[in-house]
Amino acid sequence: MCLVAFLAIAPAGWHTLQMKCSSQSEFPRIRRPLADLPQLLELGDPARSRSVPDDAACFALWDKYDMLPNIRRHSFLVAHIAATLAARAVASGFDVNVSEVRAGGLLHDIAKTYCVRHGGSHAQVGAAWAVAETGNYAVAQGVMMHVWWPWDLPAGRGICALPFFVMYADKRVRHDACVSLEERYDDLLGRYGHSEAAREGICAAFRQGKNIESALSEQLGWTLNEDSFDCGRLVS
């Protein structure tokens, strides 16, 4: 089932889809356990002293945790997009650690292979591994939150932070190709939307992704949905 069919809307283009998925009346508010916890500290504060794993260190962790080749390709593109966003933020006057954002992208799916084989939340397991292996809590936060942000999105400049760069980048990469959010979530619905609850969760994540996209576009002065981030050159 495609995302358009699930939403029962006429094939009037993705703009209609965006408006439909933005309607809070269509789906109940998705409740996740983390939403009942206090919001995390601002772990992305560049003033905090911590080491940042470079590419070689991240690739070594890929090997250590036996990351599948397709997940490596996906993670490499996510890191590229996230770092591109972070570099644009720095150029726009934001205090962002680009290397740290890149590390968050490279490691966001570090536990995906393990959880595919053995079960569990790859975001939660991966965040625990990221803390244990790097001691960098900001990178671990990016790993932990790359699937779903359980609190209200920060207003204004607060959106330009590591978790949202990694989260948005992940939402723009289907396997090893940069695609629109609409294409990404149409694929997710086809593969995982086998129940009403699953379909509601996918659509909620799509809406959140569009909200992040709009907020980042506004802060960075960049029409993100029209940009492919030169990803084609990385996988050609």
What are these regions (language model features)?
Residues 6-9, 13-49, 64-94, 107, ...:
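Divalent metal-dependent phosphate-bond-processing catalytic cores, especially two-metal-ion Mg2+/Mn2+ enzymes
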Residues 57, 121-122, 164:
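Alpha-helix N-cap/N′ positions at the starts of helices
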Residues 49-56, 101:
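Acidic-glycine-rich active-site phosphate/pyrophosphate-binding loop
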Residues 56-65:
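A short small-residue
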Residues 59, 83, 127, 140, ...:
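Short glycine-/small-residue-rich flexible loop motifs, especially phosphate/cofactor-binding loops
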Residues 78, 96-130, 141-150:
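His-Asp-centered metal-binding catalytic motifs of divalent-metal-dependent phosphohydrolases/nucleases
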